[in-house]
């Protein structure tokens, strides 16, 4: 008999395999709950404050803030290793003595208030350059961008030649800040489907250039709405000095990337998305930070252990990413990161977050090397001796979920990028879980690419495909996808490219009959996406361009490609060209999203799979009263194919991958009705018979 602590009883009831590890789970929850208590009582008199108040008060007090009524500017910075601090910039001609931050408190916080100029203007002009200078214990001086800076820009070529390429901090205080006019879309995480369009603003144009927030708003948002997605996951928003890092080497956590435009233009983008009923999620990077010193957090106050684990501890640097690792056990680090989330929810109206690098956070080995080979043995996650879990990082993730769900009750979406399969990651905090709403189903793209690369079509194992698509923890929702930005990067190929390769350059025209390669590629591209969408999870994600089979890979400008933008773009023009077959894939993707929107299968109970036939290469399943039929056989078509179904009645076709407009062959009569026979078949109470051609998928629904 196991004694199950009260604070994890709910989680153990969900997953009985947790029983032997209940004490460890309980300790992990206790640490987060203790931190939560400490934070919510970190007031002058020890009275209670909510977690969201703590986070909001933090981003409103730290950094630079302009008071429109008094015209005063306040600046607060935490730099415990510094002896003195001075604010310098264009506003005081970079005078290193005139504006000293006073009142260094016991925690290492410096503050200054700048009174308005005699003419009543703010002492620091809008968008002017600014830095903080610290004097260290040894008397040396260092210049940094304020840690909470809300705008940082690339220096001009002249400045770069003279002072180096470090980003420049700017005081952002526009006279007419953008005012949101549209409410957040109505979304209930418990019942509504999440169809996510993963996008990177900078590459969102067919032209070899950096796309702007404004262009994305005008040209890409209508495209996403047309396709039927109800959420956008925006990458590379947090400021990063190195464009080719894809946004994952963050330098300035509170600054929206200036490459794409201004903070106000990003607000307009999000507000416009909301007007279209589209949620906007931020791809948030709290797993590590750029090593940049002059324009980043590294060595910010002259020490290597202010925000991060010290280098000497062996925990301060990521072994593969060449980046710094946060010390989540520090109160001020918790403040900084939690305030960062609150800032994006409030100031930019983001509706949730996809947390990057969760596996790296969860384990002290960061999922690298031997420790990163997870077999699914619960000891790897929960054993005292063998799990190598970073309890402090896990506790931080629990607090992050507490905060986001407190700020956006019944609306917030949090997604974990975890490849390890950590149990309880997506169970509610209240029962002992980590609190995420979804985890990414990271095994799915690997499966599809491995199949296409290594197996002939007639060697595909239906049972193996179904197992991988349905292999998820009970009660923990996943975001299914067959490819994301990871698969599009240089060195890998998109699904379409694996399927059709060089033929995409010559044979995608509608002016001639499709080649065998193109015909197969288009058919399988549709089937793979539909079966992943309908069987693989409780939400779905697509990386921009892949919906229409974008050819080629992604490669950001860097020294190895001569700083070329040729592959750092999305060729939407291909999908808009009526003479190319990309439009067929685009239209199928739209119909698939709209079919899900109408009939809802994602955020429902897992499917019942009634058939996995290896010889016929058939997969049949039901989900939310819909009947899904897939024929993966490369050559065989079947007439009067018997299919089991639980509910009796008359069925009709609601989605058919063989339509000509989807690049199919129009072999299906969509006006057909299918009547059930009251005889058991494949463990279902009834059966019906269908014509199902080779490499075709059908979705049937009961006629109302």
From Swiss-Prot:
<dbReference type="InterPro" id="IPR014756">
    <property type="entry name" value="Ig_E-set"/>
</dbReference>
<dbReference type="InterPro" id="IPR013783">
    <property type="entry name" value="Ig-like_fold"/>
</dbReference>
<dbReference type="GO" id="GO:0005737">
    <property type="term" value="C:cytoplasm"/>
</dbReference>
<dbReference type="GO" id="GO:0043169">
    <property type="term" value="F:cation binding"/>
</dbReference>
<dbReference type="InterPro" id="IPR006048">
    <property type="entry name" value="A-amylase/branching_C"/>
</dbReference>
<comment type="similarity">
    <text>Belongs to the glycosyl hydrolase 13 family. GlgB subfamily.</text>
</comment>
<feature type="site" description="Transition state stabilizer">
    <location>
        <position position="486"/>
    </location>
</feature>
<comment type="pathway">
    <text>Glycan biosynthesis; glycogen biosynthesis.</text>
</comment>
<dbReference type="Pfam" id="PF00128">
    <property type="entry name" value="Alpha-amylase"/>
</dbReference>
<feature type="binding site">
    <location>
        <position position="94"/>
    </location>
    <ligand>
        <name>(1,4-alpha-D-glucosyl)n</name>
    </ligand>
</feature>
<dbReference type="GO" id="GO:0003844">
    <property type="term" value="F:1,4-alpha-glucan branching enzyme activity"/>
</dbReference>
<feature type="active site" description="Nucleophile">
    <location>
        <position position="356"/>
    </location>
</feature>
<keyword id="KW-0320">Glycogen biosynthesis</keyword>
<dbReference type="GO" id="GO:0005978">
    <property type="term" value="P:glycogen biosynthetic process"/>
</dbReference>
<dbReference type="InterPro" id="IPR004193">
    <property type="entry name" value="Glyco_hydro_13_N"/>
</dbReference>
<feature type="active site" description="Proton donor">
    <location>
        <position position="417"/>
    </location>
</feature>
<keyword id="KW-0808">Transferase</keyword>
<protein>
    <recommendedName>
        <fullName>1,4-alpha-glucan-branching enzyme</fullName>
        <ecNumber>2.4.1.18</ecNumber>
    </recommendedName>
</protein>
<dbReference type="GO" id="GO:0004553">
    <property type="term" value="F:hydrolase activity, hydrolyzing O-glycosyl compounds"/>
</dbReference>
<dbReference type="InterPro" id="IPR037439">
    <property type="entry name" value="Branching_enzy"/>
</dbReference>
<feature type="binding site">
    <location>
        <position position="131"/>
    </location>
    <ligand>
        <name>(1,4-alpha-D-glucosyl)n</name>
    </ligand>
</feature>
<feature type="modified residue" description="Phosphoserine">
    <location>
        <position position="190"/>
    </location>
</feature>
<dbReference type="InterPro" id="IPR013780">
    <property type="entry name" value="Glyco_hydro_b"/>
</dbReference>
<dbReference type="InterPro" id="IPR006047">
    <property type="entry name" value="Glyco_hydro_13_cat_dom"/>
</dbReference>
<dbReference type="InterPro" id="IPR017853">
    <property type="entry name" value="Glycoside_hydrolase_SF"/>
</dbReference>
<keyword id="KW-0963">Cytoplasm</keyword>
<dbReference type="Pfam" id="PF02806">
    <property type="entry name" value="Alpha-amylase_C"/>
</dbReference>
<dbReference type="Pfam" id="PF02922">
    <property type="entry name" value="CBM_48"/>
</dbReference>
<keyword id="KW-0597">Phosphoprotein</keyword>
<comment type="function">
    <text>Glycogen-branching enzyme participates in the glycogen biosynthetic process along with glycogenin and glycogen synthase. Generates alpha-1,6-glucosidic branches from alpha-1,4-linked glucose chains, to increase solubility of the glycogen polymer.</text>
</comment>
<keyword id="KW-0328">Glycosyltransferase</keyword>
């Amino acid at each position: 008999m196991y004694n199950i602590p009260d604070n994890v009883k709910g989680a153990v009831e969900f997953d009985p395999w947790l029983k032997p590890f209940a004490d460890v789970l309980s300790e992990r929850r206790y640490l987060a709950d203790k931190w939560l208590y400490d934070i919510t009582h970190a007031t002058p008199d020890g009275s209670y404050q909510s977690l969201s108040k703590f986070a909001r008060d933090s981003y409103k007090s730290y950094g630079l803030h302009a008071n429109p009524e008094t015209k005063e500017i306040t600046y607060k910075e935490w730099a415990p290793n510094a002896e003195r601090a001075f604010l310098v910039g264009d506003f005081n001609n970079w005078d290193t003595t005139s504006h000293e931050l006073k009142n260094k408190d016991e925690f290492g916080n410096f503050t200054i208030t700048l009174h308005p100029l005699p003419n009543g203007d703010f002492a620091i002009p809008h968008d002017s350059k600014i830095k903080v200078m610290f004097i260290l214990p040894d008397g040396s001086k260092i210049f940094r961008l304020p840690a909470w800076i809300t705008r940082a820009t690339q220096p001009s070529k002249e400045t770069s030649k003279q002072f180096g390429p470090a980003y420049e901090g700017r005081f952002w205080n526009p006279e007419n800040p953008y005012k949101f006019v549209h409410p957040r879309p109505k979304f209930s995480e418990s019942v509504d489907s999440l169809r996510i369009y993963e996008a990177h603003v900078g590459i969102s144009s067919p032209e070899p250039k950096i796309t702007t927030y404004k262009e994305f708003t005008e040209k890409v948002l209508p495209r996403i709405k047309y396709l039927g997605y109800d959420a956008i996951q925006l990458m590379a928003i947090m400021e990063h000095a190195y464009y080719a890092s894809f946004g994952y080497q963050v330098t300035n956590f509170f600054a929206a990337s200036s490459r794409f435009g201004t903070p106000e233009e990003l607000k307009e983008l999000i507000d416009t998305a909301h007007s279209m009923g589209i949620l906007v999620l931020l791809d948030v990077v709290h797993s590590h930070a750029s090593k940049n010193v002059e324009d980043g957090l590294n060595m910010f106050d002259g020490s290597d252990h202010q925000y991060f684990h010290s280098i000497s501890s062996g925990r301060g640097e990521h072994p593969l990413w060449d980046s710094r690792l946060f010390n989540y056990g520090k109160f001020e680090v918790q403040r900084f990161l939690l305030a960062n989330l609150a800032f994006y929810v409030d100031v930019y109206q983001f509706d949730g977050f996809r947390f990057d690098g969760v596996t790296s956070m969860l384990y002290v080995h960061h999922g690298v090397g031997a420790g990163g080979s997870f077999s699914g043995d619960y000891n790897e996650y929960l054993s005292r001796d063998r799990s190598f879990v970073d309890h402090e990082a896990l506790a931080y993730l629990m607090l992050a979920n507490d905060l986001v769900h407190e700020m956006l009750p019944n609306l917030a979406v949090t997604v974990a990028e975890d490849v390890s399969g950590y149990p309880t990651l997506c169970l509610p905090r209240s029962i002992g879980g980590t609190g995420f709403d979804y985890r990414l189903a990271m095994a799915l793209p690997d499966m599809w690419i491995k199949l296409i690369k290594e197996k002939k079509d007639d060697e595909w194992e239906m049972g193996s495909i179904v197992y991988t698509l349905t292999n998820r923890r009970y009660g923990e929702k996943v975001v299914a996808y067959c490819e994301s930005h990871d698969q599009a990067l240089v060195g890998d190929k998109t699904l379409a490219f694996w399927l059709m390769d060089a033929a995409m350059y010559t044979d995608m025209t509608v002016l001639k009959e499709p080649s065998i390669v193109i015909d197969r590629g288009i058919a399988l591209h549709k089937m793979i996406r539909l079966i992943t969408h309908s069987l693989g999870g409780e939400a779905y994600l697509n990386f921009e361009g892949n919906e229409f089979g974008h050819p080629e890979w992604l490669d950001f400008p860097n020294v190895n490609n001569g700083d070329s933008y040729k592959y750092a773009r999305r060729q939407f023009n291909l999908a808009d060209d009526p003479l190319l077959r990309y439009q067929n894939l685009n239209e199928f993707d739209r119909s698939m999203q709209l079919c899900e929107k109408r009939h809802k299968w994602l955020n429902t109970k897992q499917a019942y799979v009634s058939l996995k036939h290896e010889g016929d290469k058939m997969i049949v399943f039901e989900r939310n009263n819909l009947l899904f039929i897939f024929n993966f056989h490369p050559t065989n078509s079947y007439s009067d194919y018997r299919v089991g179904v639980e509910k009796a009645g008359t069925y009709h076709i609601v989605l058919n991958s063989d339509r000509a407009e989807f690049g199919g062959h129009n072999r299906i009569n969509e006006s057909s009705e299918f009547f059930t026979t009251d005889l058991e078949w494949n463990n279902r109470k009834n059966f019906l018979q269908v014509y199902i051609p080779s490499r075709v998928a059908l979705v049937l629904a009961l006629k109302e």
